[in-house]
Amino acid sequence: MASKGSGNGSRRPRRGRRSFPIKEDAHARELRAVTAQLNRLVALTAARMPTLDHPTFVSSRKCAKGYTYTSLDVRPTKTEKGHSFGQRLNLPVPVSEFPKKKVSCVQLRLNPSPTFDSTVWVTLRKLPLGYSLASESVFKLFTDGLSAVLMYQHVPNGIQRDNKIIYDLSPVGTEIGDMSEYAIIVYSKDDTLEDDEILIHVDVEHQRIPSATALPV
């Protein structure tokens, strides 16, 4: 009887030990399920983030075959009424290290701050490197008819519907090395344009370069 009792007692720990693998398997399955869910979320998030293959802001279309785009932000500084702000386009390294790659188009998209309550004219012009971007030199660029002008004005909801303009540069054979000759000109028409009242988002669509997969967007 004693031996039978001791035998029963000896089996209980074994039953307990046999249950550990079951608990471990359940934990492992739960961990795998959570990991798979996280991986799906990461993949979904990555798919929605801008990449070099992501549709550009250019009319919500994808880049032309063999092309990608580089984005820049231009923030006009304080500009008095009747005066202008100018800034040349300088593409970052390593894009600028491939000056012979073709540029197909440039898009300018305006994002106003909540305090913006004026009217601005914006244009993109190719100007010699020695050309002065001072106000007295550039106003005529808005009236000579040689380049399209985006006229952007304050609206009650804060964002004008037509807030972007596209410049097709492919007919003139523009290359990356030519971009420093292009300047964004902003004319403050009705009031003083304060610092950071407006942001100009610039998308430059150009041929892919060898290290394109490593470029930030």
Curated annotation (Swiss-Prot):
Q: Where is this chain compositionally biased, Basic residues type?
A: 11-20
Q: Where N-acetylmethionine occurs, residue numbers?
A: M1
Write the record's keywords in alphabetical order, separated by commas: Acetylation, Capsid protein, Disulfide bond, Ribonucleoprotein, RNA-binding, T=3 icosahedral capsid protein, Viral nucleoprotein, Virion
Protein localization:
Virion
Which cysteines does the record link by disulfide bonds?
Answer: C63-C105
What this chain does, per the entry, is described as: Capsid protein. Probably binds RNA and plays a role in packaging.
Family designation:
Belongs to the cucumovirus capsid protein family.
Protein name as it appears in the record: Capsid protein
